[in-house]
Design a protein with these regions (language model features):
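Glycine-rich tight-turn/loop motif centered on a GG-T
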Residues: 18-26, 52-69, 120-134, 152
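N-terminal small/glycine-rich loop or linker at the start of catalytic domains
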Residues: 1-21, 112-127
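Conserved anion-binding
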Residues: 91-154
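Non-catalytic positions within long, well-ordered alpha-helices that form the structural scaffold/packing
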Residues: 30, 34-38, 101, 148
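Active-site mouth loops of central-metabolism enzymes
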Residues: 8-31, 85-93, 129-132
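Alpha-helix-loop-beta-strand connector modules within alpha/beta enzyme cores
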Residues: 8, 55-84, 140-149
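Hydrophobic faces of well-ordered beta-strands that scaffold small-molecule active sites
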Residues: 6-8, 44-46, 80-86, 106-110, ...
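Conserved, mostly hydrophobic/aromatic
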Residues: 29, 36, 47, 108
Length: 154
């Protein structure tokens, strides 16, 4: 019998919890991770969200929040492979790097090139203004250096 790896992305990067049910808090993330784990997922891809009321649709690189989410998810899902998002616009990777250093995920996203970040609504209008998600080689190498220092696989 062949083996299959199932990855669950617990949230999208900019999904609004007021419009779609997405977990935000460490307890919510752990609960949803456990449901996915019980359904067969062995990898959890995670975007961290701001914890202030009404701000759960926005990303955060607060390493304390990341640590709380990672700890709660790992306790809920023993042996789960934690996959941290690293997507950040611009050259400053200090936020995602701090989270990688704090939680030491087994794997982390490594965006291997620049791309257009686009999202359409059902009416074919932009959900937000199109933006360039820049990932020059120097930025990728900086992420690889951080990942190498923590034993995180890209």
């Amino acid at each position: 019998m062949s083996k299959t790896v199932v990855t669950c992305a617990l949230t999208g990067v900019l999904t609004d919890p007021a419009q779609h049910h997405v977990p935000v808090t460490p307890d919510q993330m752990a609960r949803e991770a456990r449901a996915a784990f019980d359904a067969g997922a062995s990898v959890m891809h995670v975007h961290f969200r701001q914890q202030a009321p009404g701000k759960g649709h926005l990303p955060t690189w607060d390493s304390v929040v990341a640590s709380e989410i990672a700890q709660a998810s790992r306790e809920a899902c023993p042996g789960v492979i934690f996959n941290q998002s690293t997507g950040v616009v611009g050259p400053d990777i200090s936020g995602p790097a701090a989270c990688i250093r704090a939680i030491r995920p087994e794997i982390a996203a490594c965006n291997a090139g620049t791309l257009n970040y686009l999202k359409l609504r059902d009416d074919c209008k932009w959900a937000w203004p199109p933006m360039v998600f820049d990932n020059p080689v120097e930025k990728i190498q900086a992420f690889l250096d951080v990942m190498g220092g923590t034993g995180t696989r890209p």
